[in-house]
């Protein structure tokens, strides 16, 4: 249905993209029992709490620089196989520290995976360093400082993820100031678990060019108009939203309504195998379920490239491929 279309992804958590087959091999390598979390080639969870447990258990089997190179390469190879030309991966140097690998080795492994994948298929990728709300403002500021001083050409953006209900967006504004001053692109998770107010708070406190999810802005039509007027880009992940119960079904999902209202929207997969989806499926949903034609889908893909955290030369080259 969309196999002939070029694809771009702006919102995907690296550990959340771990292919089940690779995770199973990694678990065997380290002698880790993941039978409760991985059955018949699929990740198993039944509510948000068990999703987090499953996610953490899967992350446990990626431990070394080479493990992260392999994970990154494998996912980007999968994307390249469906004609994806660009991917932004959400990564957490804090996670690298927590598992004892270290932030630098964690990032180095991921960058090596990007290099290997690009060498094979030409796929471009960049990294968005994320702070995690549930670890508090100081931790998030530390993540921003790491991204700012890394001087790594593949680190081009900064994000805030984690539990949306932990603190006000304003509590984390300093981290975004640090990232902005370093020339990093800004995006933030909002309007997913929490309502439209969290999107408004993000616009007020952070002034991001993009918002991760943002779909619950639909609950406030004045806010929808504001998003359209500002040109703020939403990184929308329909499969994730349904899997987590943000909306009960695709018929009630606001992707089409947001786009028709003039909001700049893009398509991503979030944590694809955990939500039994993929970027390929998300594009197919756009066509088959939401009724977008090829030209409309290409327009969303161009929007993603226009909003990507890349230099102008790379952006121009990517746009030429659509």
UniProtKB/Swiss-Prot annotation:
Tell me which UniProt keywords the record has, alphabetically.
Hydrolase, Metal-binding, Nucleotide metabolism, Zinc
Which residues make up the annotated site Important for catalytic activity?
A: 213
What are the binding positions for substrate in this chain? 271
Q: What Enzyme Commission number(s) does the record list for this chain?
A: 3.5.4.2
Catalytic residues at 192 (proton donor)
Spell out the molecular function terms from Gene Ontology.
adenine deaminase activity; zinc ion binding
Q: Where does Zn(2+) bind?
A: 11, 13, 189, 270
The record's free-text note on cofactor binding = Binds 1 zinc ion per subunit.
Gene Ontology annotations of biological process type? adenine catabolic process; hypoxanthine salvage; nucleotide metabolic process
Look up the domain of life of the source.
Bacteria
InterPro entries associated with the record:
A_deaminase_dom (IPR001365), ADE (IPR028892), Ado/ade_deaminase (IPR006330), Metal_Hydrolase (IPR032466)
Cofactor(s) this protein cannot do without: Zn(2+)
Presence of the UniProt keyword Zinc in the record: yes
Annotated signal sequence is: none
Which reactions appear under catalytic activity for this entry?
A: adenine + H2O + H(+) = hypoxanthine + NH4(+)
- Kindly indicate whether the keyword Hydrolase belongs to this entry: yes
Q: Name one Pfam family in it.
A: A_deaminase
Q: Which family does the UniProt entry place this protein in?
A: Belongs to the metallo-dependent hydrolases superfamily. Adenosine and AMP deaminases family. Adenine deaminase type 2 subfamily.
User: What this chain does, per the record?
Assistant: Catalyzes the hydrolytic deamination of adenine to hypoxanthine. Plays an important role in the purine salvage pathway and in nitrogen catabolism.
HAMAP family, per the entry: Adenine_deaminase
What is the protein's given name?
Adenine deaminase
Q: Which organism is it from?
A: Rhizobium johnstonii (strain DSM 114642 / LMG 32736 / 3841)
Specify the taxonomic lineage.
Bacteria, Pseudomonadati, Pseudomonadota, Alphaproteobacteria, Hyphomicrobiales
């Amino acid at each position: 249905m969309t196999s002939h279309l070029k694809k771009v992804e702006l919102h995907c958590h690296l550990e959340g993209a771990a292919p089940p087959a690779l995770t199973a091999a990694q678990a065997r390598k380290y002698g880790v029992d993941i039978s409760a979390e991985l059955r018949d080639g699929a990740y198993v969870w039944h509510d948000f709490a068990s999703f987090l447990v499953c996610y953490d258990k899967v992350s446990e089997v990626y431990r070394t620089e080479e493990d992260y190179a392999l994970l990154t390469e494998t996912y980007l190879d999968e994307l390249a196989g469906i004609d994806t030309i660009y991917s932004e991966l959400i990564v957490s140097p804090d996670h690298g520290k927590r598992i004892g690998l270290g932030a630098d080795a964690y990032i180095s492994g991921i960058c090596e995976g990007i290099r290997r994948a690009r060498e094979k298929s030409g796929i471009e990728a960049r990294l968005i360093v994320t702070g995690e709300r549930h670890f508090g403002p100081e931790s998030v500021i530390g993540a921003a400082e790491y991204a700012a001083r890394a001087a790594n050409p593949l680190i081009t953006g900064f994000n805030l993820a984690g539990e949306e209900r932990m603190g006000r967006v304003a509590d984390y504004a300093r981290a975004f100031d640090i990232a902005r001053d370093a020339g990093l692109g800004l995006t933030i998770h909002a309007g997913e678990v929490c309502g439209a107010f969290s999107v408004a708070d993000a616009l007020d406190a952070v002034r991001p060019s993009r918002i991760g999810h943002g779909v619950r802005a639909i609950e406030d039509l004045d806010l929808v108009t504001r998003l359209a007027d500002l040109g703020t880009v939403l990184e929308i992940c329909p499969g994730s939203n349904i899997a987590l119960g943000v909306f009960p079904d695709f018929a009630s999902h606001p992707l089409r309504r947001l786009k028709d209202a003039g909001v700049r929207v893009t398509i991503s997969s979030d944590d694809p195998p955990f939500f039994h989806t993929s970027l390929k499926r998300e594009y197919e949903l756009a066509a088959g379920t939401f009724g977008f034609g090829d030209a409309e889908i290409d327009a969303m893909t161009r929007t993603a490239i226009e909003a990507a955290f890349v230099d102008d030369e790379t952006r121009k080259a990517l746009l030429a491929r659509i």
